[in-house]
Amino acid sequence: MSQVILDLQLACENHAGLPDEAQFQRWLDGVIPQFQEEAEVTIRLVDEAESHDLNLTYRGKDKPTNVLSFPFEAPPGIEMPLLGDLIICRQVVEQEAQEQSKPLEAHWAHMVVHGSLHLLGYDHIDDDEAEEMESLETEIMLAMGYEDPYIAEKIAE
């Protein structure tokens, strides 16, 4: 039986309307056990200022972003279930959901799935990687009962 341990940190000022811990656990359980037996993930919900600072420091981008992924790298020869940390910016997620006409819950779920895949080693730097990652995201989101998060882009093509 797989086990995903969640450490949820609420570092944003306003907690009203945030998904609860059970929802975050469900979203992690929808993606990680497909790839590994045990994992521990920290999800830190932050405001724009912290997201902006981290995005500038680690990615050189001078703006807040929806989700940042920080994979844990164990020292050689040491096996640990720590997968890494997801930093999710509440305001960016809410703004994107509104701009993209997506249900807010579905967009939160997508950010957890997207960030988790980054922790598992997936990326979207080149087109082939992006296609593979987006395909996995879509498959996972559909399996959890949500729409394809990229449906609007596919219709526009």
UniProtKB/Swiss-Prot annotation:
Zn(2+) binds at residues 114, 118, 124. Its cofactor is Zn(2+). The keyword Ion transport does not apply. It holds the Pfam family YbeY. InterPro entries: MetalPrtase_cat_dom_sf_prd (IPR023091), YbeY (IPR002036), YbeY_CS (IPR020549). Keywords: Cytoplasm, Endonuclease, Hydrolase, Metal-binding, Nuclease, Ribosome biogenesis, rRNA processing, Zinc. One of its GO terms (biological process) is rRNA processing. It is found in: Cytoplasm. Binds 1 zinc ion. SUPFAM superfamilies: Metalloproteases ('zincins'), catalytic domain (SSF55486). Gene3D superfamilies: Metalloproteases ('zincins'), catalytic domain. Its main location: cytoplasm. PROSITE patterns: UPF0054 (PS01306). The keyword Nuclease applies. GO terms for cellular component: cytoplasm. Its EC number is 3.1.-.-. One of its GO terms (molecular function) is zinc ion binding. Belongs to the endoribonuclease YbeY family. Single strand-specific metallo-endoribonuclease involved in late-stage 70S ribosome quality control and in maturation of the 3' terminus of the 16S rRNA. This is Endoribonuclease YbeY. It comes from Salmonella paratyphi B (strain ATCC BAA-1250 / SPB7). The gene is ybeY.
